[in-house]
């Protein structure tokens, strides 16, 4: 008699009662936890996408449109780590909003103001969370 399972052949009259390969036992699995973005992370993703579109409009010489007022939520959005919401962050957030407002208030110099806004993002991320910096740098208009 020949038994097979789990791609392993078992000889006649063999006893492998505790052999996990023969029994096809699966190791205990850790519970999978789905990552959910904090409201701040979601806002930053939204701002990145919007600024990427804004970059394209500036390069094409199109209208920049109106200042997206939801950006001011950067002051109140819940962060992944609330200890990051300190004086440095608040100062950098204010600089970012000012740079963003200038893009729309002075469209003739939109490229300069846009690049200043990108620089303000990088300055903040250098002090808080460096991970997104390479991605943010791609926003610069050359």
Functional labels for PLM-detected ranges:
Residues 3-5:
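C-terminal motif of bacterial Sec signal peptides marking the signal peptidase cleavage site
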Residues 7, 23-25, 122-125:
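Sequence contexts marking disulfide-bonded cysteines in secreted/extracellular proteins
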Residues 10-117, 133-142:
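Extracytoplasmic c-type cytochrome modules immediately beyond a signal peptide or single-pass transmembrane anchor
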Residues 117-129:
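The canonical Cys-X-X-Cys-His
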